[in-house]
Amino acid sequence: MSLDWLRTPVASRADPHEILLPVRTRYIVATLLSALALNLFALPGVLQSIRPDFIALTLIYWVVYHPRRVGFLPAWFLGLVMDVADGSLLGQHALAYAVLMYLAILLHRRIVMFGMRHQIAHVAAILIASQVIMLGVRLMSGAEFPGVLYFGPSLLGAALWPLLFNVIRVPLRPRSDPDAV
């Protein structure tokens, strides 16, 4: 099985005749609410501790590929919702998502030009930076260091980046015309 698709830039892999449909605000909201539902869905034991942050991944996607459509306010609000849902220190996720958004905005032009392998590395770095912020807040509030496995969800999230990339784009691709020659 060839992994050449990991090396070539996304822009050069796309069909030159493929033009994605315009993104509607309700689709962005639907993807963010779906990500919130995936974050809140209860999983048994070990799976709960390695679940990636789907909100963070979805925010990264929208900021990288449509930087003018999603801003800091939705990220901050979703962070507060996650803080309440997790029972964590209020503002912890919100601050982490704000930093995540800043890094994604800062790197979005660079990420778009890279192949999927390099995109995965950038997404992993952004997710780990976000988790470091949350860990710092926890440590300052008196919690103990959870160990290096704490960063496992970021690595798993980065590994899921190609899947998320393709799943979000499915409705944005135009339907094939049955009358086309």
Protein language model features and the residues they cover:
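Terminal, non-globular segments
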Residues: 1-181
